[in-house]
From Swiss-Prot:
Keyword set, alphabetical order: Amino-acid biosynthesis, Branched-chain amino acid biosynthesis, Leucine biosynthesis, Lyase
CDD domains linked to this entry: IPMI_Swivel
One term of GO molecular function: 3-isopropylmalate dehydratase activity
Catalytic function, reaction form: (2R,3S)-3-isopropylmalate = (2S)-2-isopropylmalate
Its job: Catalyzes the isomerization between 2-isopropylmalate and 3-isopropylmalate, via the formation of 2-isopropylmaleate.
Organism domain of life: Bacteria
GO cellular component: 3-isopropylmalate dehydratase complex
EC category name: lyase
Full protein name: 3-isopropylmalate dehydratase small subunit
Pathway listed: Amino-acid biosynthesis; L-leucine biosynthesis; L-leucine from 3-methyl-2-oxobutanoate: step 2/4
GO biological process per UniProt: L-leucine biosynthetic process
Annotated source species: Vibrio vulnificus (strain CMCP6)
Gene: leuD
Amino acid sequence: MQGFKQHTGLVVPLDAANVDTDAIIPKQFLQKVSRLGFGKHLFHDWRFLDDAGEQPNPEFVMNHARYQGASILLARENFGCGSSREHAPWALADYGIRAMIAPSFADIFYSNSINNQMVPVRLTEQEVDELFQYVQATEGAQIEVDLEALKVRANDKEYSFGIDDFRRHCLLNGLDHIGLTLQHEDKIAAFEADIPAFLR
């Protein structure tokens, strides 16, 4: 998996609190276990006026021309609440989101996002307010998320954020659960070599 060190991208401001996983990816699209293809269904009930997803809702922020190609999502508190479906971060990642910034995230969604190589950045409500004001007032506004320095940079300002060392290590090095296991491949091989033949 691709590691995440720094990323600068266009920002889409989703000015809503308590956005749940059913809004992020509605239940009717949870019929497969591949991570790919969910981006087109992201926020389906908000992005589209019809069930088939053929009539974009012109009022929904992600359909505005100025936010097309956004790779950073700016949101309000408790983003990703609701059921623990991993399809929610799959949909965001498949859409092209690399990082999310909010005052808080639901715990399971936070972990699932990191497992899918997206960086969920927690800032204070005041700092998030400042970023909303900047992004909404500035067409083409970009934000830099620097995981190495644990900084967010925007509009000539710098904000600090935290993440535990283990999760940061995984994100920086592009490690999922399989990748973490393979880091100990030599120890696994040595253990297997010591197993008696009749147990193999």
